[in-house]
């Protein structure tokens, strides 16, 4: 009994405020043991799979099988002798991955963009999680035609789909020269920011379609409410707030080793390496130490929620933007040890305060039972049922629950669905909108979902739909795609925000 308790100690904490909540993630699709057990029986019934197979793909089964979104192997040694490993059919795993790769290969942008502001990615380039995944991906092409995917087949424990690269902001020194329009916008920003009392309403209006990289750090500080509009007060405010943050470090950080804080710190320590694992910047020990301090201090100062998995992602846009204030070159590969101690302290403190301001507006997303997220997912379902009934009915037909894919969209603010450069552009608008991270985000999620309506309607089984929704091909997205997404979200908000009965049946 004691052994069982110790095994589950880190996986499910007590239901108290501040306890770690499970996070549904695309990197960890559900595995139903019953589906695996019945796989051999079902293979003999090819072509006779019913659209609704009792409870096999129901939400309750999904929730039970995804009570922990993180792989067990991420926290502790995997037991390869366990029944789940013994019953996993490798051919099924290969067939599943191959089917998804085949279905979505047509969505990948193959022509190279000659004047792109993003990092160039060869047409045949695929980011693979590990060398073993690469081998499985190569071998799967031969099995996809021989082993068609059925709803009753189980998914692999780990996805074999290439991970979506989280490429950093457009910081490369080789970026194309600014156009006349861009120069005019930059000058307008500089005039606003240098005025004695910055007109915040005008600044929000100018920032909605995107903030120039050169003035983004100070603009974000102002829009988040971290800096005052009065230019004479800014220097003293920054100095005071930065000293206050490092006062918290001196006061609280050593308590991470105390018994009542060990759970929180350990979970943070586990999650930090998972934050943007494909960007070298975030794998540097010094950067990970900065993130650990930021998250631990925030958790200590917000006991109602404490640290929840997913909050770690929200630090990264602020960190990259404030780092770009000191770095001209490509940020994602920059070695932060080249910066002075004062620069690093400024970046850390500013990231902490701006993240705190963001979370102040959405803290009910992270309190016990995460009621804010549940409410937003329900609102998304109601909204989609009105704006695209065909997509909504398609989900119902194949028993796909919105919580199965939209939980992460709300928990991580679409950060796991988009490249980091797109997240930064998205946040320009979120910080310009009233309640951008809470209210406007709902309409962005609705627009994002409908963007893929054709691909959604092409999928005709439960597993295919989930694999699509949890691995949407946005690797080549840039400012143009985000601009169109935001325009559609604004249209939906204009139509429905002031008339909630429009999306109530």
UniProtKB/Swiss-Prot annotation:
Protein name per its UniProtKB record: TBC1 domain family member 22B
Disulfide bridge positions per record: none
Compositional bias of kind Polar residues: 129-146
Lineage per the UniProt record: Eukaryota, Metazoa, Chordata, Craniata, Vertebrata
General function of this protein: May act as a GTPase-activating protein for Rab family protein(s).
Domain Rab-GAP TBC: 210-434
Organism: Macaca fascicularis
Gene: TBC1D22B
Keywords: Acetylation, GTPase activation, Phosphoprotein
Subunit and partners: Interacts with ACBD3 and ARFGEF1. Interacts with YWHAB, YWHAE, YWHAG, YWHAH, YWHAQ and YWHAZ.
Family matches, as InterPro entries: Rab-GAP-TBC_dom, Rab-GAP_TBC_sf
Pfam families the record matches: RabGAP-TBC (PF00566)
